[in-house]
């Protein structure tokens, strides 16, 4: 009886390469500073958008104003893309530098600010606002200061040894928001006291309201940053 040649089968463990500890770790942990880099890019873009919007109050040239409004929209679109990238990385990475919910909330709140800046610029164009009130200019300046504080605070979050600096920025953001509330309330009171024409009153109130809401959204970012500090202190 002839013997059959023995067959050699590769075991499943031989056919599939093993995932080493280092490979597993790189899968679980995002690239060094990935989320911090994305947030730094996001807030830098937001600051550029806020500064661009603020240029509206420095010119009376309609073509320049329209160019500024277009640029504000472009920067808002860029912010949307960065937010989407943050959400994609959040889905793809198992371990994150702080709570996933906080990362999602921080990205959403930053995006909200950009949306309201762009929304204010669009209303100025759509409503054919020809003259800007002093309060609009002052609110825009407050917004730029808030976003500048956000940009610095978010970059400081990379190292928790900067926690005190972040807390100081949070206090300043909230204080600026309170100032914006006062400016808005006084402006609306003046509109009614001056008995402005109904159409003009509606246009001014819409623009002022959107601009003031943008400052409120800055406070939302400050609240998220404070939550992150509390959880990681």
Predicted features along the sequence, with ranges:
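Cytosolic, long alpha-helical scaffolding segments
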Residues: 2-233
